[in-house]
Structure formats: structure tokens, C-alpha cells
């Protein structure tokens, strides 16, 4: 046999041995996760924004499982908070007062200063920044959660967080709709006389 064939066979056997060893170690030393944390994390919006005071959705889910409040997720809103409260069996509370009092902000890239490094795109957890390498980037304001994670990695500091004012484009018309009460028609009684 040639030395090349011996080397290939030897490497294949070595890879097979270590593969079996790793498979055994994975089964023997398997760490069971907390299933309630997995369920809580599935409910959270996965923006990894840190507005709750934790570095991501998984740590916040672990904190909720350990008894922290369920009302600290501004991107998730009231619907997420109610689902979390239902799962944990606690009373729903209004969203965190700090989160509600803050004006919603979105990222704004000063495109004339942008060098197209793509670091902000990589940092954005919701893909709200579009652009390509060596070209200017821009933010899709409808998708931006205002998490502020894109500001720090920018090497030329061309990203600002600006407050979003209400205008015709972002006004929630259904929220401020005029209440309408439907009246059921009743058969009229015939006039006598």
C-alpha cells in the first residue's frame, strides 16, 4: 500500500473515533434547559435590543422565569406582555412606565458621512438597515425598533437616534377611530287609529 492510502485510511479512522467520542460526550454530559424559559423566549420579539435592561431576549426570559416582572419589553408591546403574564400565571400590568414615557426613536444615518462599512447592518437585530459594502446605508424607519445597537459599532459616528413625530405616514388611525355603536333594527308597530 502506498503511504498516501495509509494516511487517508488513518485520518478516516481517527475522524470516526473522535466523532463517536464527541457523540458519546454529548449524550453523557447533556445539560437540560428550562422548558419555561424556552417558551418565554419564543413569546419575546427577539430584537435583542436591551430596552428591558437585559442584554437580550434569552436573559430576560430567564429573569422572568426567576420572578422578574413581565412588563419590561417595549418592542413586544401589550400583546407580548399579556402572553407572558398568561404563561407565568401572573396579573398583566401596564408596560414599564419608563418605556412608555420615552418618545419612540429610530436610527437615522447621515448618508453623506457613511463609509459603507456594514457594521451597523451586522448589529441591527431586525434588519432595518439596508445597504451594501462601500455604499451608503439607510434605515427602514417602519422596521426600526429604536434599540440603539447600531450606533456604537459605527466607526465614523454617522448614526443618530431621532424621535419619531406623528404625521400622516405613521399615525395609527384605528387607535383613534371614532367609536361607532351599531343599533339593531326592530320591527315597527303599526299605528292604530
From Swiss-Prot:
List of residues binding [4Fe-4S] cluster 2: 114, 117, 120, 154
Region spans: Hydrophobic: 1-26
Listed EC numbers: 7.-.-.-
KW Cell membrane (keyword) present: yes
Residue intervals of the 4Fe-4S domain: 32-90
Gene Ontology CC annotations of this record: plasma membrane
One example of a Gene Ontology biological process annotation: electron transport chain
Cofactor annotation remark: Binds 3 [4Fe-4S] clusters.
Residue span(s) of domain 4Fe-4S ferredoxin-type: 105-134, 136-164
Compartments, record wording: Cell inner membrane
The protein's required cofactors: [4Fe-4S] cluster
Chain coiled-coil ranges: none
Domain of life: Bacteria
A Pfam match: FeS
Keyword ATP-binding included in the entry's annotation: no
GO molecular function: 4 iron, 4 sulfur cluster binding; electron transfer activity; metal ion binding
Binding site for [4Fe-4S] cluster 3: 124, 144, 147, 150
Coarse class of the protein's main subcellular location: membrane
Binding site residues for [4Fe-4S] cluster 1: 49, 52, 57, 73
Keywords: 4Fe-4S, Cell inner membrane, Cell membrane, Electron transport, Iron, Iron-sulfur, Membrane, Metal-binding, Repeat, Translocase, Transport
Function summary: Part of a membrane-bound complex that couples electron transfer with translocation of ions across the membrane.
Subunit note: The complex is composed of six subunits: RnfA, RnfB, RnfC, RnfD, RnfE and RnfG.
Family recorded in the similarity comment: Belongs to the 4Fe4S bacterial-type ferredoxin family. RnfB subfamily.
Protein name: Ion-translocating oxidoreductase complex subunit B
Amino acid at each position: 500500500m502506498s503511504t498516501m492510502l495509509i494516511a487517508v485510511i488513518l485520518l478516516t479512522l481517527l475522524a470516526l473515533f473522535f466523532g463517536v467520542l464527541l457523540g458519546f460526550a454529548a449524550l453523557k454530559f447533556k445539560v437540560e434547559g428550562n422548558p419555561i424559559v424556552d417558551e418565554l423566549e419564543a413569546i419575546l420579539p427577539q430584537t435583542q435590543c436591551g430596552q428591558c435592561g437585559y442584554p437580550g431576549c434569552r436573559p430576560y426570559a430567564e429573569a422572568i422565569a426567576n420572578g422578574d416582572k413581565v412588563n419590561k419589553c417595549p418592542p413586544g408591546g401589550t400583546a407580548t406582555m399579556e402572553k407572558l403574564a398568561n404563561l407565568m400565571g401572573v396579573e398583566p400590568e401596564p408596560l414599564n412606565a419608563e418605556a412608555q414615557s420615552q418618545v419612540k426613536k429610530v436610527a437615522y444615518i447621515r448618508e453623506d458621512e457613511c463609509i459603507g462599512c456594514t457594521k451597523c447592518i451586522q448589529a441591527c437585530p431586525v434588519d432595518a438597515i439596508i445597504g451594501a459594502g462601500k455604499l451608503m446605508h439607510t434605515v427602514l424607519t417602519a422596521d426600526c425598533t429604536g434599540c440603539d445597537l447600531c450606533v456604537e459599532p459605527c466607526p465614523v459616528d454617522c448614526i443618530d437616534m431621532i424621535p419619531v413625530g406623528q404625521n400622516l405616514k405613521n399615525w395609527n388611525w384605528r387607535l383613534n377611530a371614532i367609536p361607532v355603536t351599531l343599533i339593531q333594527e326592530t320591527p315597527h308597530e303599526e299605528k292604530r287609529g
